[in-house]
Regions:
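Peripheral interaction segments used for macromolecular assembly
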Residues: 1-93
Length: 93
């Protein structure tokens, strides 16, 4: 039996930086609150953790630290998600 967990799209992964962090364009206007959330792909596989938000307020980017053993370049061009319940929790802060 599969459990349905709603996901919230946070943005698309654009590239992998030299230090190994993935850079994703964030769709949320309150992106600073996303730091610390676990990111996933559409299949609910963990990708990594949002470590920082950079760029201008109206066009933010998230720096995602990939989990160990993950080939980050495989996710370039793909959407990144967080669990809806986690997203709602941090947006209420």
């Amino acid at each position: 039996m599969e459990v349905y967990v709603p996901l919230r799209r946070i943005g698309v992964i654009l590239h992998v930086a030299k230090d190994g962090l993935m850079v994703a364009r964030v769709n949320s206007s309150k992106a600073d609150r996303l730091v610390g959330l676990v990111t996933m792909d559409y299949s609910m596989r963990r990708i990594g953790v949002i470590k920082d938000i950079i760029g201008p307020v109206n066009a933010p980017y998230a720096l995602i630290k990939p989990i160990k053993g993950l080939n980050a370049t495989d996710y370039v061009g793909k959407q990144a998600y967080v669990r809806d319940i986690d997203y709602d929790k941090v947006m209420r802060r």
